């Protein structure tokens, strides 16, 4: 019987173990998409205790706590202490067997805290609380200290076009920070004209760009100014959360002006008008990314804020989102082609939340590759609910079957937690075990030089190359 979470966790044969320990584990982390707070990096935040760093803002854990019947006051309540929330989590973790949270929890205790051979639960919670809090009180366990311990080379934060990026400026000016922290452009509130807050947001964009927006070309001018601002801060990637993937042929500016005017006047838009405006903004933005050498990321298929009562109580991003089932292939094909037809499709990473769409994306990327850029269009790593062993394996296998796994840009945390870098370790172990199994079965050569190069490329080198602006 195998022992739980040894040094060879998830590594089933000698080839896999060699690939992981000798080649994957030492590689730096290039975390090109996350939701870390740039302010916490700039200020080098020191965390008061394990409950704070572990549970604050982590909606993966919040969902598990709710599923275990824990009262909301012990999850997000301001009236309860970090310790009380921590103990609620300690009582919940033994109930998460089979959920990736059980693995992640013990990996996070192992690295960076060095706690091994101890199962986390109510019986061990007090001892672990004390050990971890002692370490969190030291400089090595500040926000930046943890990033350095985890060998992080680069992080891409997620930032709104109206953001001042003041903390990115602060980080860039601080010579003591040897980790690159780049903003990523997230313009969801610009192209989602159907949202209730669209008009209010446009007012904020006007103020940030110093451009009055009454026509579509005004919007282009405002966005161009903000794109320039992001570029000056080292931005090299955009990200778009797309719940419903729409497409319509882009109309002329007169029609776009009319659509924008109707929305500003508070009139209801038709579904066609919404699709026309959304497509026009996305295609125009995509062409700007291509001209700047940026990467365009499309995260497709979430249903957000399903629970109205809890949304009113807690707001968005609190653990009430799930997988959508809208069809995406036709609209995605037309959207990408609208940029590619003028040779203005940027480097692009496609992510789907519904795993039934894996093959859609794995085959779609082959339609729009380009010379001079290996893996120009990527099928991104298993996202969100697919960010677990089975989901990662499905994505790796389907990409390898329908594309080139060797050109894959690899893993990202997509997380708000400084302890989530162990997800890169989790991914690397799964990757090495997959390659090791193929080699052991004679499906690929047992060639250490060939396989090690592929592992190192997927773990770090491909992403570093891909996100470099030439």
UniProtKB/Swiss-Prot annotation:
Its EC number is 5.3.1.12. It is an enzyme of class 5 (isomerase). Disulfide bonds: none annotated. GO terms for molecular function: glucuronate isomerase activity. GO terms for biological process: D-galacturonate catabolic process; D-glucuronate catabolic process. The keyword Isomerase applies. It catalyses: D-glucuronate = D-fructuronate; aldehydo-D-galacturonate = keto-D-tagaturonate. Belongs to the metallo-dependent hydrolases superfamily. Uronate isomerase family. This is Uronate isomerase. It comes from Salmonella typhi. The gene is uxaC.
């Amino acid at each position: 019987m195998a022992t739980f979470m040894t040094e060879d966790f998830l590594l089933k044969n000698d080839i896999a173990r060699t690939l992981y320990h000798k080649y994957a584990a030492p590689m730096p982390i290039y975390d090109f998409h996350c939701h870390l707070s740039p302010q916490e990096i700039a200020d080098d935040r020191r965390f008061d205790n394990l409950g704070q760093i572990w549970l604050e803002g982590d909606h993966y854990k919040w969902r598990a706590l709710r599923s275990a019947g824990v009262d909301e006051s012990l999850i997000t309540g301001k009236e309860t202490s970090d310790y009380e929330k921590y103990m609620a989590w300690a009582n919940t973790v033994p109930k998460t067997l089979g959920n990736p949270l059980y693995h992640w929890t013990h990996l996070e205790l192992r690295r960076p805290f060095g706690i091994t051979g101890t199962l986390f639960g109510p019986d061990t919670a007090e001892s672990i609380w004390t050990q971890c809090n002692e370490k969190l009180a030291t400089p090595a366990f500040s926000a930046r200290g943890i990033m350095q311990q985890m060998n992080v080379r680069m992080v891409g934060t997620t930032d709104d076009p109206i953001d001042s990026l003041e903390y990115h400026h602060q980080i860039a000016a601080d010579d003591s920070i040897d980790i690159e922290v780049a903003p990523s452009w997230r313009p969801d509130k610009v192209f989602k004209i159907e949202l209730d807050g669209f008009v209010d947001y446009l007012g904020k964009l006007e103020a940030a760009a110093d451009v009055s927006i009454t026509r579509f070309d005004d919007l282009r001018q405002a966005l161009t100014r903000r794109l320039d601002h992001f570029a000056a801060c080292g931005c090299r990637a955009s990200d778009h959360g797309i719940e419903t993937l729409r497409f319509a042929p882009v109309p002329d500016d007169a029609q776009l002006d009319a659509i924008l005017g109707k929305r500003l006047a508070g009139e209801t838009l038709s579904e066609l008008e919404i699709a026309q405006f959304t497509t026009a903004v996305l295609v125009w933005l995509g062409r700007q990314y291509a001209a700047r050498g940026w990467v365009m990321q499309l995260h497709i298929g979430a249903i957000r804020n399903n629970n109205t009562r809890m949304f009113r109580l807690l707001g968005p991003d609190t653990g009430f989102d799930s997988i959508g089932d809208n069809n995406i292939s036709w609209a995605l094909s037309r959207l990408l082609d609208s940029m590619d037809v003028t040779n203005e499709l940027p480097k692009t990473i496609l992510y789907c939340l519904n795993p039934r769409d894996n093959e859609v994306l794995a085959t779609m990327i082959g339609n729009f590759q380009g010379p001079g850029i290996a893996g120009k269009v990527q099928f991104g790593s298993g996202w969100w609910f697919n960010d677990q062993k089975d989901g990662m394996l499905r994505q790796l296998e389907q990409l390898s079957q329908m594309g080139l796994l060797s050109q894959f840009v690899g893993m990202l945390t997509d997380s708000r937690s400084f302890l989530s870098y162990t997800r890169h370790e989790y991914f690397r172990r799964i990757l090495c075990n997959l390659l090791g199994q193929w080699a052991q079965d004679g499906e690929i050569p047992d060639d250490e030089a060939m396989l090690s190069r592929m592992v190192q490329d997927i773990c770090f080198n491909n992403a570093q190359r891909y996100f470099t602006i030439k």
